[in-house]
């Protein structure tokens, strides 16, 4: 089952140009991963608990590296996507379970992206009744035509405005001693909202769709076993970049909003955190980045989801396939976009809560995907000499166990009537 393509040796490839070339996709993926739900979750963490949730980020960075590196390595060794490997290793019935989890999680996240678009454009005075249908149509057209790649880098560039959180954090004047302590000393609270936010943070940092996307990207690049080292550089750099930005979002909101007692209930509240650097332009800066990041993810998620499902069950897929050739592939994309847009347009819907809830759903369903991934990655017959080592297996199973326990605690608290 291993990918036997002949490649030049890895040693020949480890030049400065090759290393920087390998880092590019990971860094871009990191920025696109900080989407509407991610910004909402990290902003809420800082606004609600100050720096007290920073300790999670070093842990999440390690776990993100583990899951993304595993995905990339599986792609290099087998030349196949995760969905195909799940079907081959576990059969069709268990593939249905994996794909159902992915479909639910990704649809929830896509809904949050449209909520982010609606929230961002509302700051410019555009009502959701106008913005959501128009953007949904544009997303559908770009996804169906495959022309999304033409504007992908532009959107990534615009979404880079969230890097300004790094500058804003320094300008806000945080207590760096307190930041350093909270970064390394775990702060566990029995507050139900805290537990929910922990699950959401895990779900937005290690999203199920990112695992499928990482492996598919490696397969699409025709990377082989000799590319594993370069792909490892890619994953490590991307994971660190993603969580550095996440950390500064928490520091910024923890410095600006938490002392003032401002709880984030909408995009306008979150935008206030950028006032130290942008002043009266903070709303414009935040809204532009939120819309770009949300639109980017909204274009990626339906395609990733549909491609994985079709791959798992052997159906035709790809933007180059017509409706007659790939009706299921195109139908799933259309359904996800349509359902997401309609739900966001429902009267009285809380857009910010949608963004938060989607990340909780991500966290709850993540163990399902991780179980399949770790079993495949540890299989000698599939991975050969590149199978998971003991440390990687322990970290992955520990992640699965912790998330499962947190999920049970969260649901028990809800059943007991506590507000989560």
Regions found by a protein language model. Give the residues of each.
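Extracellular/periplasmic helix-exit of transmembrane alpha-helices
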Residues: 65-73, 77, 218-219, 240-269
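Helix-loop-helix module between adjacent transmembrane segments
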Residues: 63-71, 93-113, 122-147, 203-204, ...
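Loop-to-transmembrane helix boundary motifs in multi-pass membrane proteins
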Residues: 92-93, 129-134, 237, 241, ...
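Flexible loop linkers connecting adjacent transmembrane helices
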Residues: 2-7, 41-46, 69-94, 260-275, ...
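Transmembrane alpha-helical segments of multi-pass small-molecule transport proteins
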Residues: 97-99, 123-144, 161-165, 327-342, ...
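Extracellular loop-to-transmembrane helix junctions
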Residues: 17, 44-69, 83, 87, ...
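Hydrophobic alpha-helical segments and their helix-loop junctions in multi-pass secondary transporters
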Residues: 160-187, 195-216, 372-381, 406-418
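Juxtamembrane transmembrane-helix boundary signature
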Residues: 29, 56-90, 98-108, 253
């Amino acid at each position: 089952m291993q990918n036997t393509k002949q490649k030049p040796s890895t040693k020949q490839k480890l030049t400065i140009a090759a290393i920087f070339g390998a880092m590019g996709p990971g860094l871009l993926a990191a920025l696109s991963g900080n989407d509407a739900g991610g910004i909402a979750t990290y902003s809420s963490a800082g606004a609600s608990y100050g720096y007290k949730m920073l300790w999670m980020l070093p842990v999440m960075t390690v776990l993100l590296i583990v899951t993304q590196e595993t995905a990339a390595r599986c792609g290099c060794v087998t030349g196949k996507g995760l969905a195909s490997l799940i079907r081959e290793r576990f059969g069709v019935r268990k593939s249905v379970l994996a794909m159902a989890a992915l479909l639910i999680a990704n649809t929830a996240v896509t809904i949050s992206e449209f909520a982010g678009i609606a929230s961002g454009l509302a700051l410019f005075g555009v009502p959701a009744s106008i913005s959501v249908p128009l953007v949904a149509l544009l997303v559908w057209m770009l996804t169906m035509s495959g022309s999304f790649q033409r504007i992908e880098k532009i959107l990534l560039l615009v979404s880079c405005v969230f890097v300004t959180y790094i500058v804003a954090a320094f300008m806000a004047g945080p207590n760096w001693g307190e930041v350093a302590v909270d970064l390394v000393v775990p702060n566990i609270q029995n507050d139900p909202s805290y537990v929910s936010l922990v699950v959401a943070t895990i779900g937005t940092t290690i999203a199920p769709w990112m695992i499928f996307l990482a492996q598919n990207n490696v397969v699409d690049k025709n990377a082989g076993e000799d590319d594993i080292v370069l792909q490892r550089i890619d994953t490590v750099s991307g994971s660190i970049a993603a969580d550095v930005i996440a950390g500064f979002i928490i520091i910024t909101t923890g410095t600006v909003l938490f002392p003032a007692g401002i709880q984030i209930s909408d995009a306008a509240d979150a935008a206030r955190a950028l006032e130290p650097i942008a002043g009266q332009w903070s709303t414009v800066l935040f809204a532009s980045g939120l819309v770009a990041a949300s639109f980017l993810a909204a274009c990626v998620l339906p395609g990733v989801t549909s491609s994985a499902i079709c791959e798992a069950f052997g159906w035709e897929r790809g933007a180059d396939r017509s409706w007659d050739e790939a009706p299921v592939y195109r139908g799933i994309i259309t359904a996800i976009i349509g359902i997401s847009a309609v739900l966001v347009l429902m009267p009285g819907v809380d857009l910010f809560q949608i963004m938060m809830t989607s990340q909780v759903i991500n966290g709850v369903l993540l163990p399902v995907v991780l179980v399949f991934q770790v079993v495949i990655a540890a299989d000698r017959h599939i991975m050969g000499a590149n199978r998971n080592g003991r440390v990687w297996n322990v970290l992955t199973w520990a992640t699965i166990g912790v998330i499962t326990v947190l999920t049970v605690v969260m649901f028990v608290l809800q059943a007991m009537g506590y507000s989560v």
